[in-house]
Every structure is written in structure tokens, then in C-alpha cells.
């Protein structure tokens, strides 16, 4: 039973047995490319089963967070693992779980950190997949952080989510990256989601 996708009106495309829905468009992000990344990340993590990914807006993620976690706030990424005895995907493969990503927060983080939004979506997808595999950064004494850093390097991604949250620093060189324009003086900063 895939409750996460109740919010989705149109199912777009199944890529490599992973359902990717871009409910909110992000420049340069395509469903098939994200589906291929999810497959690579799932294999790198050692997770078996289909992973469905929803890229949506902050309001939808906040609604999911409230409905399933009783947290009435938005966040960047949510993971919904499926127990081994429950759901199967549409192709009959075991469903490992589902990941919901806030495109709004991903865009803010990407801008603040000086890398493309597509990379930020991938970082959040990797973080969600690690949670589906049973990692829990709140209780594992750094195990998830180490694994995420290792996989981030292997998958050629910038600083992993946990590394950013714990360091809370961005080098001046990254802030002035040519990938993103400099902020205008007085521009408001993005909210941090810890």
C-alpha cells in the first residue's frame, strides 16, 4: 500500500523499476535521470526492492510530515520504509519504500551552498535511501554520516546532508561558485532545516 502517492494526481514514468514523480519541476532535473540515480544509489547502499521518489513542494512535504510523523513543519526529505511483509511494486518487485523531497528546500539549499539544484535533489534522495536501508543518524553514533560521506564521494556528489548539518559552514569559495550567481546585498537567507 503506497500511501505517499495519494498526493500525486498523475503518475509520470517508471524508470528502472523505480517510480519517480516530479510534481514540482526543477530546472535540469528529468525523471529518467533521477530514476537512474536512484537505482545506482540503491545498489550502492545495498538496499533491495523498488524505491519510489516524489519531488514536490514544501506544503506537500509538510502535510506528509504531519500525517505520518505528527510533525507540523516542513523538512527537506522524508523516508517511508515498507516492511518486508507488506507492499509489492506494480512490477511485482518488493517495495523497499518511498522518499518525498521538498524541491523548495532543495533549491534554497543548493543556492546557499553553491551547487546545482539537481545535485541537491540527488543528495536528498541518497539520504532518504539510507534511511530506507535502516540507517538512523539520530541514534547510530555517526554510522549513517560515514556511510553517506562514502557514498557521496562514490556517486560524485558535493557535501552530504549530515556533513552539512554538523559543520554548518560553507567555504567562501563555494558561496561564490560560478554555478550560482552571488546574492544581492540584503537578500534573505534560506531557513536551515536541521
Q: Where do the PLM segments sit?
A:
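An acidic/histidine-cluster motif and surrounding catalytic segment
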Residues: 2-121, 130-194
